[in-house]
């Protein structure tokens, strides 16, 4: 993690030494699930709610102050939740170009993911950005369920909803489909152009995989709607949402 600099590296080392559960989220998770994003060096972690205060205390001991909106503009869906604790990795003051690098911690309860759904990262797979050795990750079914439940909790025009739906469609697309070419079936099946046999077979395999996911009993609807999306019966906009306009 040499790209982080001494301060952020020390902070993550202290969190590891304090047995803080760090679960990758946002960019690094999407990359691990196959979505070929270009990381800018930011790190995002889910933390058990009961440990988030400890994260802030350790950060303060090391001289870190939370970055507020006037210093660090919220860009990623998890930041727009209003629950993220954010720290600047760099001391740069530019406000143009790529988003400034950030170290972000978020309560796990926002995603609905529980500690028994996460798994350790067992090998150094060379993915970037590099993470602490003790970091955990989220398997595809649990990640997709989290994206869907977050989207369902938000109002239809919410930036958070739009962001997590994009993440949901992207990780499924790159995990379950051959994205080396542009298929027309990713969300809406065309009315005037039949699918090729290869595309039909790919959809069948993806649907079979989604149906095999072990989700919570009260969240079987997530599998049902994803199957409907990839068989052309629905679109991602049909995911449930909260009622009322977004302020």
Give, region by region, the residue ranges found by the protein language model.
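Charged/polar, solvent-exposed surface patches and flexible loops
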Residues: 13, 57, 61, 224, ...
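Generic structural motif recognizing short loop/turn segments at the entrances and edges of beta-strands
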Residues: 18-21, 41-43, 62, 83-85, ...
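Catalytic cores of NTP-dependent nucleotidyl/adenyl transfer enzymes across multiple folds
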Residues: 82-247
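Surface-exposed beta-strand edges and their flanking turn/coil or helix-capping segments
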Residues: 37, 60-61, 118-120
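Metal-dependent nucleotidyltransferase catalytic core
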Residues: 2-8, 47-89
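Active-site nucleotide-donor binding segment shared across nucleotidyl transfer reactions
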Residues: 4-57, 235, 240, 246-247
